[in-house]
Amino acid sequence: MRNKGLIIIFMLLCVLPSEARKRHIVNISHEYQSVVVNEDSTVTFCYCGMGKRVSVYGDFFYAGEDSTRYTDLRSKRVKMKRESDGCFHATTRPIQSEVYTYCFKVNGKRKNDPLNNDTAWQMTHKWNIVTVGGTAQTALYQQPAQRGTMLHTSWYSSAEKLNRRVNIYLPAGYSDTLRYPVLYLLHGISGYEGSWSERGRAIQILENLVAQGKCQPMILVMPDVNVKPQEGTPTHRSLFNNIMNYSRLCHDHDIERALVELTAFVDSTFRVSDDHYIAGLSDGARMAANTANLLPNYFSAVGLFSPVVHKEQLPKDSATYYVYSGKKDMFHANAIRFNRRLDKAQAPHEYTETIGGHTWRNWRLYLSDYMIKINQ
């Protein structure tokens, strides 16, 4: 009987993964935090899964090296070190107050943080999100006491003969006796209807501005403006197909016609005042300008963030255009040319130039500034 027990133990040892047969046996049953923002504005990452080589990569290391250095759609990878608890750890330098994205790489394969449900899609990948406080920007990302309501719904596009998804935010205390300004926010070529609320933090920005008395309560409308509307949760393939259909997006105005129908849907369904605004980032800025021209005198202001716009997008009414661009933005020259055309056309507009590039950290700042200006 004793020999039989020894045989069973030997067989179990043989089938254990090689990693577990070594000294480093990872006890993933104990409680741990995968990401911690420390008091000195450093961030510590922890990964306790199986693996020999683990790295963390994201857009936060660049900001720690140089407070004015920004990157366009690139991330830096840093190796994590296995410590006495059997888990892998890495800590950044002190970094700025911002919303950062990160992901793990385990044995050469990309892996999201399983303990962090705060995620967002960017290009064709899902990223985890960590928010760092500590400066004046913190107020943009703190959670106020009163929160509004997010509705996930759809509207019918007769031009395309299909339903398009849209997220609609109603402010805290939404009342049947009041009417509210409405702001339409359009994502870029690789986004979807959740981009502005997830990566853009549009709701937190608005609610904090309201709490600070810099903005009145507003309805936010964030539609899916992809060439082919997403079915279910975005995937690598669906977002990639949208990017590949970019040429069609630039020449097919069915999406803008669908947005015109969206305004009618919103006006008839919610308590909207006569104050209508629209803004978009990157190619969403082009769609915002086109939609404004399809609805002359409907929008009081148009926000163009890192815009991909041309002379045909010049305004056809008296709406004020707010153009924003970073000096390192890939479309910076385009924004400058469009601003000159606005000057020549004597159209009411403001141009704001910042450091940085084609990044969400800039678009969040642009949105905050735009919201404040349209409420003045």
Name every feature range the model reports, one short phrase each.
Residues 174-180, 185-233:
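Short substrate-entry loop that stabilizes the transition state in hydrolases
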Residues 320-324, 328-376:
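C-terminal catalytic histidine-bearing segment of alpha/beta-hydrolase fold enzymes
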